[in-house]
Amino acid sequence: MMNGFSIANVQGYEIIDSRGNLTVRARVTLESGIRATGDAPSGASKGTREAVELRDKDGSVKGAVDSINYYISPALMGLDVREQGKIDRIMIELDGTENKSRLGANATIATSIAVAKTASISMGLEPFMYIGGARTHTLPVPLLNILNGGLHAGNMLKIQEFMVIPVKFDTLKEALIASTKIYKTLKSLVTERYGKIYTALGDEGGISPPLSVTEDALKLVHEAIKRSGMEGRVFMGMDAAASDFYNPEKGVYEIDNTSKSPDEMIEFYVDIASRYPLLYLEDPFEENDFSRYSELQSRIKNVIVTGDDLFTTNVRYLRKGIEMKSARGVIVKANQIGTLTETIQFFDLAKDNSIKTVVSHRSGETEDSFIADLAVGLNSDFIKTGAPSRGERTSKYNRLLEIENEFGLEYLGRRL
């Protein structure tokens, strides 16, 4: 029976992301006329176990758009938009593959997000309230990627992200103001040493100076923290994205103009953690090396070793990581698995096992701020959404500030 919550139509179409690539937008319209959209982000550094992003040979996403218009829309017509789990299960069954390779995870996640946003509007709820239900909501700590390397930049750094983490602050606003001060200080440092031309931004809004050695990047970020007067309040983080510089034929990591064995990489990270205020380390090894993750985490207990490519937002791999005690943290990327329902199942499994959670963007983003609501709705410990620059990044931070201003939620920084 049709009612005001019934889905009348789902339309897919192509839009442009922050890297100038085409991506998928889905728009869900209800019989009542209420409608909302969801966008599919896209990563540059991808785990091999991620759900499949359908992309045509010419770079378009027409195949994924067709999946929405010719398969997903008819299957969802007439369903109650509030039944997120049922809708996501229908898309999973309609796809029929383990990795969303028939419909495309970019088609299913765009639709899943659009369904959630439309449902929240129809119920008169903020998206984070709709997602989280009765959970007590808090504001996550941002991991701000202020210096870019790896596949996100045009320099020779192998480590992909160098982050600042504003912990010892009472509000998110204070934390972000401190972070923007550090970001501007870093820009000034790079200008002083290399010239203004080298303050060009990477894919995620971070600065990309002409560096090739990890230590030089760490020194720059640490000096920016100290010059800003934030030492002891703001910590450091890295996303190595180590699968991208691992040579499987030789079994070595090609970094800093040399080759390191997996055991040498452990000592490399242990040394960094002993000399810098390192709180967070993501993807330190290639995506299949669960045992080295475990060994490193046991060596640097105060650092949150975090798996992204290791787990790819998939409960099967997270269960393995839990069994092997591979990591204290997990990245949560909805497009890696393809529906919000599966994303939340992964998130809850991590939380149930006292693992820190990081709701994350991708390097190819849009201005859609949905992941800010997702992070707040799920009570994520952290959110990762780039530097405090570029509109597709600041839209998420500004949504968090809007939530803080309107609802007065607690900032998690001092609880970590």
UniProtKB/Swiss-Prot annotation:
(2R)-2-phosphoglycerate binds at Q160, K333, R362, S363, K384. The active site is at E204 (proton donor), K333 (proton acceptor). It is found in: Cytoplasm; Secreted; Cell surface. Its EC number is 4.2.1.11. Keywords: Cytoplasm, Glycolysis, Lyase, Magnesium, Metal-binding, Secreted. Binds a second Mg(2+) ion via substrate during catalysis. Mg(2+) binds at D239, E282, D308. PROSITE patterns: ENOLASE (PS00164). One of its GO terms (cellular component) is cell surface. The keyword Magnesium applies. Its main location: cytoplasm. Pathway: Carbohydrate degradation; glycolysis; pyruvate from D-glyceraldehyde 3-phosphate: step 4/5. One of its GO terms (molecular function) is phosphopyruvate hydratase activity. It comes from the Archaea. The keyword Transferase does not apply. One of its GO terms (biological process) is glycolytic process. Its cofactor is Mg(2+). It catalyses: (2R)-2-phosphoglycerate = phosphoenolpyruvate + H2O. Belongs to the enolase family. Catalyzes the reversible conversion of 2-phosphoglycerate (2-PG) into phosphoenolpyruvate (PEP). It is essential for the degradation of carbohydrates via glycolysis. This is Enolase. The gene is eno.
